[in-house]
């Protein structure tokens, strides 16, 4: 049995999050649809227990004040992967710092790719499909008139219980401690 994977995300519960979820459904209706989010720690096995991981997350996040990020222009990871995403244009360094602080001890993992703060829109099966999705996504993003700012004040520790089936384990406030769901 493969080991469980865990991640730390910031759900985007705002109009820009609704935009992302709608765009995902438009570009790839057959994919399982995850809530719009920024990933602080990409999926990984733990180097200890869930309880130890939560303690580490709470300690580090408790010392980090909430902050804002601003999303940039639509991009893709082509040719590395056929993925369309929105990078973080402002606040990227804060996310990188927090990622580095969290990617230690029980949460330590040698990630496959360098950490790039972003919101994934969709991962397609092929590069041509991703190029087509990117063109549509750019057009929709240019038409989007809402705020591209996201306040990061709460993160969520999640576990993958089945392929593409993530379960929320615990919300954690920045500048605070575990919060009740």
Task: Annotate each language-model stretch with its function.
Residues 1-181:
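Histidine-dependent nucleotide/RNA phosphoesterase domain, centered on the 2H-phosphoesterase fold
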């Amino acid at each position: 049995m493969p080991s469980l994977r865990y991640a730390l995300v910031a759900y985007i519960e705002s109009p820009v999050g609704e935009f992302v979820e709608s765009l995902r459904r438009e570009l790839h209706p057959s994919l399982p649809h995850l809530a719009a989010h920024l990933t602080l720690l990409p999926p990984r096995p733990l180097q200890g227990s869930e309880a130890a991981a939560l303690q580490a997350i709470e300690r580090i996040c408790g010392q980090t004040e909430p902050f804002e990020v601003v999303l940039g222009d639509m991009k893709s990871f082509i040719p590395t992967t056929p993925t369309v995403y929105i990078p973080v244009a402002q606040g990227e360094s804060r996310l990188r710092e927090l990622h580095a602080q969290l990617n230690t001890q029980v949460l330590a993992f040698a990630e496959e790719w360098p950490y790039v703060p972003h919101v994934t829109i969709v991962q397609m099966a092929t590069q041509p499909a991703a190029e087509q999705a990117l063109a549509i996504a750019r057009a929709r993003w240019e038409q989007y008139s809402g705020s591209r700012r996201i306040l990061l004040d709460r993160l969520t520790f999640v576990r993958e219980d089945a392929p593409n089936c993530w379960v929320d384990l615990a919300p954690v406030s920045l500048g605070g401690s575990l919060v009740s769901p």
